[in-house]
């Protein structure tokens, strides 16, 4: 690691015109991050011929105080305080000379807390990811992880409800919650949509949800959907004696429309509303604030996240989104299934779940966690597992994801050959059988298939589900995997 080559204040600096970022003070290998610093860890692929330390300094500069040339107004402020400081650039394992992959570097950059507006995800992201991803000095850039200091976390409200209070409201403890996404997600009339909701809840699910792109279309106005869904929720609750819910998607074109829809959902007695990630950070924080004020659970669908999280060398890791959304104040977020149809390496998904559920998340390189993170008493976020899962995978889902999770069987409920209610029954019986086996001390992972077969002897819907989907899985290689086993590389 090279030493600092900063050109000091004075004639040499201000007559230099354009000087490398490394010499402008943005590369400080001797810097010791303060407890109050925000630290971002980027995966940098420098352009050919660009020194990795210069690339790291360029990212630090362009994400804080720098522009492309020296400016005289630097002398009117405390640049030494406000400059971001790149202090490490470590070669990523299995890249560079002697490998088939071009060289990539993990660059650690520290930002003074005063650079950011308190309690604003929008302002935080405007600096960290606002301009640097199009910078010519880097061929590719990915934000892998961040350490958020307690001093900054305390300026955010965090989840409006949290896992503990949600379980108390539902009176459901010791097991994952069960849900489903209404299918087909587009095209149903309001009445038929409500019927799907009723059948699924009556069969034993705790929740049903709108999908990300059901808002207010010609085939079903949002108000009709809300009315029919809440009628279904109330009837199912009365029939089963259990607390039920439906995630009413209030995503809309404007904040005024979103507030109107949320208020209407509340007036109908809904306990939960839903928004999509694509509404943006300000809208998410605004709805989280509304949800806390109005005693509502806020579900976030991560619609759009893979446009920037899927590729390993460019964009942003989903674990960063998990951190930001916990700060922003959502109660639920889709975080992967491991065994379903969507991208998800088991180790990476474990890191996502730990980020959402831990009070303190320790460094764990095998799970992609590069920093110790104290969550400053922010409530936990309930992870949601959805996409290509079915009753035959119940033992695997509990093994990988634990019990603080919402398992959403959309096609695995509504695609059941005996009907929607039978699909819900199959999932509920499979879950109860697996939890009972776990609580009895059985090796439910090894014995899982047999446990399900035994339960299916007394439950025809579960037998039909197992016969229909058998051992269907989606075994594709993940694009986002751990880079190394634990080493000293990630120590701050």
Curated annotation (Swiss-Prot):
Q: How is the cofactor bound?
A: Binds 1 Mg(2+) ion per subunit.
Q: Identify the residues that bind Mg(2+).
A: 209, 211-212
Q: What class of enzyme is it?
A: lyase
N6-carboxylysine PTM positions? 209
Statement: the UniProt record of this protein carries the keyword Coiled coil: no
What Enzyme Commission number(s) apply to this enzyme? 4.1.1.39
Q: Keywords, A to Z? A: Calvin cycle, Carbon dioxide fixation, Lyase, Magnesium, Metal-binding, Monooxygenase, Oxidoreductase
Q: Where does substrate bind?
A: 131, 181, 185, 302, 334, 386
Cofactor field:
Mg(2+)
Extract one GO BP annotation from the record. Answer: reductive pentose-phosphate cycle
Q: What catalytic activity does the UniProt entry give for this protein?
A: 2 (2R)-3-phosphoglycerate + 2 H(+) = D-ribulose 1,5-bisphosphate + CO2 + H2O; D-ribulose 1,5-bisphosphate + O2 = 2-phosphoglycolate + (2R)-3-phosphoglycerate + 2 H(+)
MF-aspect GO terms: magnesium ion binding; monooxygenase activity; ribulose-bisphosphate carboxylase activity
Which Pfam families is this protein grouped with? RuBisCO_large (PF00016), RuBisCO_large_N (PF02788)
- Catalytic residues, per the record, are 183 (proton acceptor), 301 (proton acceptor)
The text of the family note is: Belongs to the RuBisCO large chain family. Type I subfamily.
- HAMAP family given in the database record: RuBisCO_L_type1
Q: What does this protein do?
A: RuBisCO catalyzes two reactions: the carboxylation of D-ribulose 1,5-bisphosphate, the primary event in carbon dioxide fixation, as well as the oxidative fragmentation of the pentose substrate. Both reactions occur simultaneously and in competition at the same active site.
Its quaternary organisation is: Heterohexadecamer of 8 large chains and 8 small chains.
Q: What is this protein called?
A: Ribulose bisphosphate carboxylase large chain
Q: Which organism is it from?
A: Nitrosococcus oceani (strain ATCC 19707 / BCRC 17464 / JCM 30415 / NCIMB 11848 / C-107)
Q: Which gene encodes it?
A: cbbL
């Amino acid at each position: 690691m090279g030493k600092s080559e900063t050109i000091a204040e004075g004639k040499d600096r201000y007559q230099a015109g354009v000087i490398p970022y490394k010499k402008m003070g943005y590369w400080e290998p001797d810097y010791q991050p303060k407890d109050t610093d925000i630290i971002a860890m980027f995966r940098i692929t420098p352009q050919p011929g660009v020194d990795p330390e210069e690339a790291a300094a360029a990212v630090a500069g362009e994400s804080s105080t720098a522009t492309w040339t020296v400016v005289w107004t630097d002398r009117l402020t405390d640049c030494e305080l406000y400059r971001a400081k790149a202090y490490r650039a470590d070669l990523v394992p299995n890249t560079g000379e002697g490998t088939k992959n071009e060289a990539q570097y993990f660059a650690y950059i520290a930002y003074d807390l005063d650079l950011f507006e308190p309690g604003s995800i929008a302002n935080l992201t405007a600096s960290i990811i606002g301009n640097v991803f199009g910078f010519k000095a880097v061929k590719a850039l990915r934000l892998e992880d961040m350490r958020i200091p307690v001093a900054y976390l305390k300026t955010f409200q965090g989840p409006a409800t949290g896992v503990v209070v949600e379980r108390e409201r539902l009176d459901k403890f010791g097991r994952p919650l069960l849900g489903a996404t209404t299918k087909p997600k587009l095209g149903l009339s309001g009445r038929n949509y409500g019927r799907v909701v009723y059948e699924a809840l009556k069969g034993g699910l705790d929740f049903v949800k709108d999908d990300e792109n059901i808002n207010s279309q010609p085939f079903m106005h949002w108000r009709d959907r809300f009315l029919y869904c809440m009628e279904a929720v109330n009837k199912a609750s009365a029939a089963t004696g259990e607390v039920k819910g439906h995630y009413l998607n209030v995503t809309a074109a404007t904040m005024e429309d979103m507030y109107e829809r949320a208020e209407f959902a509340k007036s109908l007695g809904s306990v939960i509303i839903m928004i999509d990630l694509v509404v943006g950070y300000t809208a998410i924080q605004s709805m989280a604030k509304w949800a806390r004020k109005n005693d509502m659970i806020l579900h976030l669908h991560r619609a759009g996240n893979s446009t920037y999280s899927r590729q390993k060398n460019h964009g942003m890791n989903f674990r960063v989104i998990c951190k930001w959304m916990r700060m922003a104040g959502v109660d639920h977020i889709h975080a992967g299934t491991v065994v379903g149809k969507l991208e998800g390496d088991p180790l990476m998904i474990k890191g996502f779940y730990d980020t959402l559920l831990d009070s303190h998340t320790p460094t764990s390189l095998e799970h992609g966690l590069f920093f110790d993170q104290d969550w400053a008493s922010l409530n936990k976020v309930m992870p949601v597992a959805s996409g290509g899962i079915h009753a035959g995978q119940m033992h695997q889902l509990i093994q990988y994801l634990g019990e603080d999770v919402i398992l959403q069987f959309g096609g695995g409920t509504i695609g059941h050959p005996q009907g929607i209610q039978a699909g819900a029954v199959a999932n509920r019986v499979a879950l109860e059988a697996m939890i009972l086996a776990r609580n009895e001390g059985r090796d439910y992972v090894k014995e899982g298939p047999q446990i399900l077969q035994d339960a299916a002897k007394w439950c025809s819907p579960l037998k039909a589900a197992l016969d229909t989907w058998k051992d269907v899985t989606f075994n594709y290689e993940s694009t986002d995997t751990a880079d190394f086993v634990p080493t000293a590389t990630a120590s701050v």
